[in-house]
A protein has these predicted regions:
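Residue-level signal for alpha-helix termini/capping positions
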Residues: 78, 152, 190-191
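Short, small/acidic-rich helices and loops at N termini and domain boundaries
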Residues: 1-21
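Phosphate-binding/switch region of NTP-binding enzymes
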Residues: 56-57, 62, 66-67, 179-282
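DNA transaction DNA-binding modules
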Residues: 155, 276-306
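The Walker A/P-loop phosphate-binding site
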Residues: 16-114
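Conserved inter-motif catalytic segment of the P-loop NTP-binding fold
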Residues: 45, 61, 88-180, 273
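Short gly/ser/thr-rich secondary-structure transition/capping motifs
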Residues: 35-42, 141, 217-220
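Structured loop/turn residues at beta-strand edges in well-structured enzyme cores
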Residues: 52, 91, 154-155, 193, ...
Length: 306
């Protein structure tokens, strides 16, 4: 028999396309028929975070990232908004963390819960919607396999891993290592499970030029490590302290998709009487802050006035 098989090598390669190859196809019909206001994969905001997407939340050491994370996951697990950032429904959330023991977690949970005035029914709901795990040993492939089992077992919508440093298991400044970990090892888990993945991360020392604060795009790359981190994630959030105030004040900037939120930057401060993050108006100066300002020194005179 003659004229059997492919006419050319290119035709042969085309015929060998796998199901995985076909799953990457997006047709013009798909694009035209997509309804962004009714996306079944939407989880939070106006398609801000979707199923299978990712976010990195970066901030300095000792500024309260753990309590911030606690407040976020409690609100979203209850189906409530975090300063205007609202989930489409109560989300099933899992947290894996390495830096706090059970007592630390309990203090943060109880403190934030008291600050948010959670009710008995809220607590009952959280028992179903929110899970915590402490894992301080596994890194790299072993950690990802552990997280994958957790996602499947608990049918998670969102998983938070805190911090990235503890679980990467390599050199975060090595772009090759970071790319393989995020794109070749973690991303398939997100595609398989459709979970939204949030890393908590440490920020490198902020570099300011000419006394000016960093721009949003500069903040996006402020997390310690390779720029591949910012390239990979759907959203980058950076918590940075502003000024010297009591209570301490911060800006939470959403650097990549903040335009999908009510506000791309949220002005936050530590609660004055409880463990809770509160929003403040940066244009309002209180009487106490005015008293803290140094009085004008009228003894200091210019040389040419003597």
């Amino acid at each position: 028999a003659t004229n059997l098989g492919s006419a050319s090598w290119e035709d042969y390669l085309t015929s060998r396309e796998t199901d995985d190859d076909q799953s990457t196809v997006v047709s013009i019909k798909d694009l035209m028929s997509f309804d962004s206001s009714n996306d079944p994969d939407n989880l939070i905001g106006q398609r801000w975070l979707t199923r299978g997407s990712s976010m990195i939340v970066s901030g300095g050491t000792g500024i309260g990232k753990s309590s911030l994370m606690m407040q976020i996951v409690i609100q979203w697990a209850l189906g409530k908004d975090f300063f205007g950032i609202a989930p489409v429904r109560p989300l099933k959330i899992g947290v894996i963390q390495a830096e706090n023991d059970k007592g630390d977690l309990a203090e943060a949970f109880q403190g934030v819960g008291f600050g948010l005035n959670l009710t008995g029914s809220d607590m009952k709901m959280l028992q179903q919607q929110l899970e915590f795990r402490t894992e301080a040993v596994r890194t790299g492939d072993q950690f990802l396999a552990y997280a994958r089992r957790f996602i499947h077992k608990s049918k998670l919508d969102v998983i938070v891993a805190d911090p990235l440093f503890s679980y990467f298991g390599g050199d975060l400044s090595d772009q090759g290592e970071v790319s393989v970990f995020l794109r070749n090892k973690l991303q398939p888990i997100l595609q398989e499970t459709k979970v939204a993945w949030i890393w908590m991360h440490h920020i490198s020392k902020a570099q300011r030029k000419d006394g000016e604060p960093m721009t949003t795009m500069e903040l996006a790359h402020a997390g310690f490590g390779s720029s591949e981190l910012a390239n990979w994630a759907r959203e980058i959030a950076v918590l940075a302290e502003v000024g010297q105030f009591k209570p301490r004040r911060f800006q939470l900037a959403f650097c990549k998709r903040g335009g999908r939120l009510p506000k791309p930057i949220i002005n936050l401060q530590h609660g004055t009487d409880r463990i809770k993050w509160e929003e403040y108006n940066p244009l309002v100066i209180t009487g106490a802050q005015l008293k803290e300002k140094k009085p004008f020194n009228n003894k200091a005179k210019r040389k040419d006035s003597i």
